[in-house]
Amino acid sequence: MEIGELRPLKEMAVKPGSVFRMRFYPQDGIVPKDSSDTSRDKYFIILGKDNKGGYVALSLINTAINENLRQRIGAFQYQISSSDYEFLNGKDRFVDCYDMKEVASERIIEQGDYAGLISETDLKAIIKLVNDSPIVSVAKLKRYEIYYVD
């Protein structure tokens, strides 16, 4: 039996550092790969939860850095190694720390597939980059209790 099939375990897994895979749509701010597609499956890392637990803040995991945006967002992309994480399927990827998405916890529990857990070292580095991002507001960081502690 997998964790994705067990709601109570999945609820416990919705916490900072957990990685899930879920389908996103244009209304989520995610552009499908092909013009004929209406959605896109993405891996993401949970960074924090609001104090009521109804929403989480997350960073998306991308296969590559968008070349059209590299100059603006490149410094806020954190590379994670496939040798450290089985769910990466043998390919290093990038965590987008330039921006973070806000998603209902219930949606992740209902639709997300648990993939794994990011190491404390990687999570700390990701949180630092998110805190340094010029577009993530202090109010949003406070709402989700995403603080970088050296």
For the regions a language model picked out, list residue spans one by one.
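Mixed-charge, Lys/Arg-rich low-complexity intrinsically disordered regions
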Residues: 1-14
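Structured loops at beta-to-helix junctions and adjacent beta-edge loops in soluble globular domains
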Residues: 23, 61, 98-100
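C-terminal terminal-subdomain/extension
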Residues: 77-150
